[in-house]
Amino acid sequence: MTMLSVIEVLFALVLVGAGYWWISKKRYERKLKWIPKVPGHPIFGNVLDFAKTTDTLKVLSSYLKQCNGLCSVDLIVKKKIVISDLKLLELLLTSTNEFLNKSVEYKFLQRWLGDGLLTAKDERWRKSRKIITPAFHFYILRQFVSIYETNADTMIKLLEKEVGKDSVDIYTYVTLCTLDIICETSMGVKINAQTNGQSDYVFAVKEMCRITVDRGFSAMKRLDLLYALTKDYYKELRYVKTLHSYTESVIRARKKSLLSDHSKNDVQTEEKLKNVYGEELGAKKKMAFLDLLLQARLDGEPLPDLYIREEVDTLMFEGHDTTGAAISFALFCLAENLEVQAQAVEEQRTIFGKDSNRAVTFDDIQAMKYLELVIKETLRIYPSVPFYARNSVRDIEYKDGQIIPKGTSLVIYAYGVNNNPEIFPNPEKFDPMRFENMEKTSPFAYLPFSAGPRNCIGQKFAVHEMKAVISKVLRNFELLPAFPRHKPLLAAESVLKSANGIKVQLKPRKWD
């Protein structure tokens, strides 16, 4: 075959491939024609609207207002269907098969988290969910209270140095506290992030969160071939090696310890947990999330170390920044709403009496009913994960012949749902009492932890942690608005953050 013939064959193959892609694209778009399309640039589509993470929420809210809760957004490489419509959300979030898998963006976490619960698909996800659920059992959660307490104590000592200043960025302190908490509860080790924030592990966690966000918002870095040419690619390889090495070393040490302490290695049932730990779960050795995985079984065999590492790393990623953001925004809301703060403090006085320095107990946390309303209202206005996406695994008929094609990426816009004035009148107002009577409201009208089978498995753990840390702050400090007055500049990253910090003013709390 001559060189000319080879070129002709290659050219023909390219034409056939391009033709197939074009026909498939048009067929796909025909199926989606029932969904309102957001007008955009003829070449770049709507991608330029998302140049800054601080624009994302405004842009998506504007789109959905124009299109009544459902719209198609063109991001060049892929169309996204953005949703705040409750009926379609119910279909998506209650699906046990059709919309169970996460969208393609989650692959950016694959090198770090592997097939952990956040990124897992199909059967792996089902098995993992079943294995991990006992780790968030009532009797396990009780033992973590002392961990919340000791790490919150460290944060209070650090915050005391900020008393009297016009403003302090509370987020900086809170996220290191939640990182310490998640490390100790998940792996059973103290990393002392609050007092040693420059450790290799802490730095690697922060950088991996940044790299993942940057890649998700970069048209170039989204493509594997082009991403491999960037500095972040090589940084990611280095940071992932650091993170994996640390987790693996902890797994080896905990496995050795458990083998010497236990002869039985099966998933703990409720009765066994009572027998081993007693009602208070304080008399014997604490069980970290990792210890429970080391005792678990998959098809009758112990979990492989790789499987365990992926799940522990996933909990680390999901469990520190989300909770840190929620606590920080809650403290900001309390500083800006002094009447609400006064009521929250009164509840703390009722629980703790004259001894504000007493260690919090699990029963104390359960008694913090008003503080729970404060947390719910905070998560309504500032949901830690403002949107998340699912992929359809086959063509799905929604209603009246309306088709959601296979491979469609559907973005669940939790921020828009939570701030819908038809569901929550006067949504800008911080009003915890609106959650006193929510029985008649659709479970899909409020999505701080998602909903359905792929909801947040650790939501009770997160709320308990938030209560313990916020309670500790309220018993030690009076929260006031920062000076000059601060308004968070919301940025949709891996979690909802504020590009200009989350600032308050601190004064010593007079308890007597």
Report each predicted region and the residues it spans:
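Cytochrome P450
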Residues: 2-16, 74-81, 139-150, 160-184, ...
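Conserved cytochrome P450 catalytic core segment spanning the I/J/K helices
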Residues: 48, 59, 137-139, 240-327, ...
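Conserved cytochrome P450 K-helix E-x-x-R motif and the immediately C-terminal K′/meander segment
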Residues: 47-68, 245, 249, 358-402, ...
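Cytochrome P450 heme-binding "Cys pocket" and the immediately downstream C-terminal segment
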Residues: 338-341, 459-497
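Central I-helix of cytochrome P450 enzymes
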Residues: 178, 182, 187, 239-248, ...
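N-terminal membrane-proximal hinge/A-helix region immediately C-terminal to the signal-anchor transmembrane segment
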Residues: 2-127, 142, 146-158, 235, ...
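Cytochrome P450 heme-thiolate "Cys pocket" and heme-binding signature region
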Residues: 134, 318, 436-466, 490-493
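Conserved cytochrome P450 K-helix/beta-meander segment immediately N-terminal to the heme-binding cysteine loop
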Residues: 412-439
